[in-house]
């Protein structure tokens, strides 16, 4: 089932807009084979499919984020981590990444409580990927 997840309705359109100006890559704790299958099945327009697997650690270990930046030939301050999980954003900001929070209120079951309040330290807070593209001038 993980290999065939349906993306959020705004995702492909928003990523396609963002890709006109930025290099887009995944960074997940899932393995590369899983992420490639997910991207292919969902039509996600990644430039690169990266995984914490490549650093041989799991996020939020700083090495996962730093390895991703290094593999893309970028300094940490040139990278923006986009996530619906605040812990992921906080960890990536600790290594110098910029951050964009896109909350997904319906990600979990209705009885699962989550704090969706944006952290004031996040660089961008967007309602979805199309809103994020608009905020970044696309």
What are these regions (language model features)?
Residues 16, 30-32, 36-138:
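Asp-based, Mg2+/Mn2+-dependent phosphohydrolase catalytic module
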Residues 1-25, 36, 62:
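Short, acidic loop-to-helix structural element flanking the phosphoryl-transfer center
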């Amino acid at each position: 089932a993980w290999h065939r997840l349906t993306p959020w309705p705004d995702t492909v359109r928003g990523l396609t807009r963002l890709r006109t100006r930025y290099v887009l890559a995944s960074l997940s704790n899932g393995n590369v084979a899983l992420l490639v299958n997910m991207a292919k099945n969902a039509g996600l327009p990644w430039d690169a499919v990266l995984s914490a697997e490549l650093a041989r650690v799991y996020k939020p270990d700083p090495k996962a984020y730093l390895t991703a930046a290094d593999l893309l030939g970028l300094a940490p301050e040139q990278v923006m981590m986009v996530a619906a999980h605040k812990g992921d954003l906080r960890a990536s900001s600790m290594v110098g990444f910029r951050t964009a929070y896109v909350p997904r209120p319906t990600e979990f079951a209705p009885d699962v409580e989550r704090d969706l309040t944006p952290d004031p330290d996040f660089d961008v807070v967007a309602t979805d990927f199309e809103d994020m593209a608009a905020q970044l001038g696309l």
